[in-house]
């Protein structure tokens, strides 16, 4: 079968036999795919230096007749993050890997945009903003200016319950102040905001509860 070429992000590598890897990618035109990288674990394999996460990749593969395709070539482009952000970047890829399953036609552009958010925001806020963005494009978040249950305009203090922002009439739970809501909106719009430690912890917990509500395993930064 003819080879296919596409831009991609590497999500994960799984050892297969003593010499090969199963690689999961988010590709621009083909969504999430899994490919066999034959011989990639051998010391002299050309794949060893190029199969790295957090780089812009261009991959070529041959589709399988009945199952997994075979990776043919990988061209590694520029790094997508500064080294100091690598751990947060890997967490973001782990969450993207759980959001976008094999066969999903989406994921590449969404994850690429989330990585840009991570790169451009202050370190305290970057991962929060990037994951919040992914949850938003997944359709799991609403407008912070209204109750997500009844649609009423947000009050001074709202509550986070069952991964939703609720007014006092619709529920109770973890308080979410108007200041935090405004700060989240500002950060997501590109503003520079100094978060109090309490507000950052609350935003992180909001994210953790959304992941939990949708049975997505939390990464280390979001474990309660």
Question: How would you label these PLM feature ranges?
Answer:
Residues 1-21, 26-224:
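Non-catalytic alpha-helical scaffolds and adjoining flexible linkers that form interface surfaces
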């Amino acid at each position: 079968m003819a080879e296919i070429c596409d831009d991609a992000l590497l999500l994960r590598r799984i050892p297969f036999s003593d010499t090969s890897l199963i690689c999961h990618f988010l590709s621009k035109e083909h969504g999430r795919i899994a490919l066999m990288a034959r011989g990639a674990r051998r010391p002299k394999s050309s794949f060893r230096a190029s199969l790295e996460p957090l780089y812009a990749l261009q991959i070529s593969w041959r589709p399988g007749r009945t199952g997994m395709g075979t990776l043919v070539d990988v061209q590694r482009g520029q790094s997508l993050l500064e080294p100091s952000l690598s751990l947060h970047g890997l967490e973001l890829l782990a969450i993207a890997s759980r959001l976008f399953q094999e066969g999903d036609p989406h994921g590449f552009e969404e994850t690429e945009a989330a990585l840009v958010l991570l790169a451009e925001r202050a370190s305290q806020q970057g991962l929060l903003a990037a994951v919040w963005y992914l949850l938003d494009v997944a359709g799991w978040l609403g407008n912070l200016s209204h109750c997500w249950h009844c649609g009423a305009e947000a009050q001074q203090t709202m509550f986070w319950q069952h991964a939703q922002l609720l007014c006092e009439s619709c529920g109770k739970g973890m308080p979410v102040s108007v200041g935090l809501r405004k700060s989240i909106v500002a950060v997501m719009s590109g503003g520079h905001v100094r978060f109090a430690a309490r507000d950052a912890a609350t935003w992180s917990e909001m994210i953790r509860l959304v992941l939990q509500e949708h049975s997505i395993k939390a990464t280390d930064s979001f474990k309660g």
